[in-house]
Curated annotation (Swiss-Prot):
The gene is gmhA. The reaction produces a racemic mixture of D-glycero-alpha-D-manno-heptose 7-phosphate and D-glycero-beta-D-manno-heptose 7-phosphate. Binds 1 zinc ion per subunit. Keywords: Carbohydrate metabolism, Cytoplasm, Isomerase, Metal-binding, Zinc. This is Phosphoheptose isomerase. Pathway: Carbohydrate biosynthesis; D-glycero-D-manno-heptose 7-phosphate biosynthesis; D-glycero-alpha-D-manno-heptose 7-phosphate and D-glycero-beta-D-manno-heptose 7-phosphate from sedoheptulose 7-phosphate: step 1/1. It comes from Aeromonas salmonicida (strain A449). The keyword Cytoplasm applies.
Amino acid sequence: MYQELIRNELTEAAGVLQAFLADEQNLKNIEAAAKLLADSFKQEGKVLSCGNGGSHCDAMHFAEELTGRYRENRPGYAGIAISDPSHLSCVSNDFGYDYVFSRYVEAVGRRGDVLLGISTSGNSGNILKAIEAAHAKGMKVIALTGKDGGKMAGLADVEIRVPHFGYADRIQEVHIKVIHILIQLVEKEMAK
């Protein structure tokens, strides 16, 4: 009854991934981002990750697989998703939602750390403020974006952009694949 819909959804998802894969710059950017992360971990740095909605879940997924594991057993890496409910509700109430991530970066971020900001539109105000705070702290910034990169375009040390202008879930599907590849590459770099 729904097989045609299922086929169309999977075909569209595969097409978005193929278009992303066809741009060699995306592969270079993923490699550069993994190197930034590994360099930070080698210097006892950490990565702070943030996003909204499904991208928030991706930020938590990323941190979990750094501190826990991905495919193989290995030492944990310092990954923190900015997701503490008491922090988020306090800052939202007292300062406004645009500051929920930047206040955390200001408090916890240090020179040599990395911020991973995830926004399918590239226009999330709270991610933009987190990027600004990270730069002020001397942190490196990796951005996972979509569409044309939005306001985040050009603000990160490394931007990995999924140039899809349809539904955000297609962008998120590529983002989670990129996250898994980043962790795999970090593990290889750390094993050197």
